């Protein structure tokens, strides 16, 4: 049975598809230029909107480069940030901007990778030029472009695309009818494809068969829980967090795939007695968090959220103070690559050696 709204949005989706394909054709035929960066570029992005596990993969790649002695920089758009233009989030020694100024995901990457330079800019080319100008004395070995599969104005040494296997990817429709930014055939631009959020390997089989026809290297990964971090009171500590199975909680989040958050908690034995969800990147207000706190207090529940939501609130410390009178935790996740890790590592090393 067809969704009436979907049918109404279909003409707009067809129009969007035509525009996307025209733009890509112009880049493919070099009628629109792609700038060559003086620093090697690794792009990590996806074909769909949100929920692919991109940020944990960016974090994994940054940590891998650091582990082999490379100095990575991260350039992100900083979605829903309050600042404008090119902004230095971290100079690789100190985080300089709040999450409200840099965007929640970018702040999370900066705090979790203190040795990496992090910049936000809508125009990534301007961010690269800023980096080259201001960090000539300690130039990064590689620049990681976050969420840049569609950002074709910059050439890249390695183009990584992520697919969320838990969603009906092969039948997904284009924006605004569906969640796709580009049609599936545009995966041909990818040098490497990461099949992510694989909980059931059989679910990935149809996508694997479709993609293998292209001959693009495939990596298989899942999102795993790294730790539960307590941020009640004045401290932040994973050591203070109790076993997950002992927690009865109100879960709240403003992410694109809230059900995956609940599923992760459920698999670890957390009892979710209530939940409150908001749209992705939605700013928290004192009113919303007061309502959440009062519900948790009346039911005797702990509060648990995502790491991204924690960093979004961190930009406004007065908001965190509203809820931390109760036990509060955030769930830290990571990318677990269970097939093809050596291929990914080899291609990451090769990208740096290209210049």
UniProtKB/Swiss-Prot annotation:
Tell me if Transferase is a UniProt keyword of this record.
yes
Top enzyme class, one word, equals: transferase
Cited Pfam families = LpxK
Q: Where does ATP bind?
A: 48-55
Q: In which pathway does it act?
A: Glycolipid biosynthesis; lipid IV(A) biosynthesis; lipid IV(A) from (3R)-3-hydroxytetradecanoyl-[acyl-carrier-protein] and UDP-N-acetyl-alpha-D-glucosamine: step 6/6
What is catalyzed by this enzyme? Answer: a lipid A disaccharide + ATP = a lipid IVA + ADP + H(+)
| MF GO annotations | ATP binding; tetraacyldisaccharide 4'-kinase activity
Output one GO BP term. Answer: lipopolysaccharide core region biosynthetic process
This protein's GO cellular component annotations are: plasma membrane
Entries under InterPro entries matching the protein: LpxK, P-loop_NTPase
Task: List UniProt keywords, sorted A-Z.
Answer: ATP-binding, Kinase, Lipid A biosynthesis, Lipid biosynthesis, Lipid metabolism, Nucleotide-binding, Transferase
What's the Enzyme Commission number for this chain? 2.7.1.130
- SUPFAM superfamilies named in the record: P-loop containing nucleoside triphosphate hydrolases
**Which superkingdom, per the lineage?**
Bacteria
Q: Which family does the record claim for this protein?
A: Belongs to the LpxK family.
Function description? Transfers the gamma-phosphate of ATP to the 4'-position of a tetraacyldisaccharide 1-phosphate intermediate (termed DS-1-P) to form tetraacyldisaccharide 1,4'-bis-phosphate (lipid IVA).
UniProt cross-references to NCBIfam families, sorted A to Z: lpxK
> What name does UniProt use for this protein?
Tetraacyldisaccharide 4'-kinase
This chain's source organism reads: Pelodictyon phaeoclathratiforme (strain DSM 5477 / BU-1)
Q: Identify the gene encoding this protein.
A: lpxK
